Amino acid sequence: MDGFDVSQAPPEYRSVEPIANLFVLGMGLGWLINYVGMIYQSFKDETYGMAIMPLCCNIAWEIVYSLIYPSKSLTEQGVFIAGLTINIGVMYAAIKFAPKEWSHAPLVMRNLSLIFFLATLGFLTGHLALAAEIGHSLAYSWGAVVCQLLLSVGGLCQLLCRGCTRGASYTLWLSRFLGSSCTVGFASLRWMYWPESFSWLNSPLVLWSLALFLTVDGSYGICYWYVRQYELSLKEAEGRKSK
């Protein structure tokens, strides 16, 4: 049974499919808010909000599973295509403003467009290779796991390396967390009510990935708060000096 084809789902899953679709819509809403917010924040702060490698991996995954191996669920199709369309804007903003973040590394700064292109091409072929190796139904989920872990770890590392909240906000963090948590929600329903195709979601590696996502994304919120407080303390100190 192809776990990607909802029309072949057992009656148990079909009975909870409307709830699963709500989680899919929640996933889409969270990520669309995140993408639009990143475009806004990028132009506001003249930087990029998502680390380069996670961004390239993410847009490559969306290309593969929006255009090459589209879901047979119309809800998922709509969410993925909408996400890909807006993510192109995220990529444009990143390419436009990334040179300002790499003035300390001229070789990188002068070749960022090429780096974005090659990284996206590399991840695109990687997602396709994974689909050819284990089938696109499984590769869809495992590729998404890789994207999520890169996003979580890359986002936290970027925040700590910059030492400031430039290109970030609570809205971006919470919308990303909402979108990913909804993904966990509908995956859980598939595992519980469609075990013939999704029993593997209870595997140690999936559970480890889930624990890592929750730990790192939860840590991001705490670290963001500390960095923001540090920024505010510096601003207050400068204000007192100017008096």
Swiss-Prot record:
Q: Which cysteines are joined by disulfide bonds?
A: none
Q: What class of enzyme is it?
A: lyase
Q: Subcellular location, in the record's words?
A: Membrane
List membrane-spanning regions: 19-39, 48-68, 78-98, 112-132, 137-157, 172-194, 205-225
Where does the UniProt entry say this protein principally localizes? membrane
GO CC annotations, alphabetized: membrane
Q: Which EC number(s) does the record attach to this protein? A: 4.2.3.-
Q: Which InterPro entries match?
A: PaxB-like (IPR039020)
Record keywords: Coiled coil included?
no
The superkingdom listed in its UniProt entry is: Eukaryota
- Record keywords, A-Z: Glycoprotein, Lyase, Membrane, Transmembrane, Transmembrane helix
Example GO molecular function: lyase activity
Q: What does this protein do?
A: Terpene cyclase; part of the gene cluster that mediates the biosynthesis of the indole diterpenes penitrems. The geranylgeranyl diphosphate (GGPP) synthase ptmG catalyzes the first step in penitrem biosynthesis via conversion of farnesyl pyrophosphate and isopentyl pyrophosphate into geranylgeranyl pyrophosphate (GGPP). Condensation of indole-3-glycerol phosphate with GGPP by the prenyl transferase ptmC then forms 3-geranylgeranylindole (3-GGI).
**What PANTHER family has UniProt attached to this entry?**
PTHR42038, TERPENE CYCLASE AUSL (PTHR42038:SF2)
Q: What is this protein called?
A: Terpene cyclase ptmB
